[in-house]
Amino acid sequence: MNNIIILKKYAFSYLSKYNTSKKNLDRILHNKVRRMKLNKKDKYTLYSSIASIITGLEINKLIDDKNFTQSKIHSLSLQGKSKISIISYFVQKGIEKNLIEESFENLELKNPNWEKESAKIFARKKRLGIKYSANFEKDLAKMARAGFSYNLSKKILES
């Protein structure tokens, strides 16, 4: 029982520092239990209590995957990330595909040119384009590796 309280406190302290998804918090709590020096029986009881801890946090609105995806999409697009790299980030964090698509649709309605702006930010941060570099193919390859389409990359690098 005491270990469950410790695990709840760890979840609260983690959530006070970071905004995260349910699946990611589940992974973090599993890792915490794995690192604890307990016998197998106690670890199994803690593993089974993780789901109830997460549902309690979700009921109290401390974890919200929809809010997490919308805020992360906004911040990652301002960092110069492409749609493909943002989707791979969310898949890694365990966000459902339909929630990702819904969040992208909301972003497209608010700002239809967000990916173009994000590509401009990426090119500026990496010093790509005619102003900085004479090697167009290398710059184009760097944009492609970042997940931007060929046509969009070509437009950004030529301007």
Question: Language model features by range: what are they?
Answer:
Residues M1-S159:
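An alpha-helical, amphipathic repeat domain used for nucleic-acid recognition
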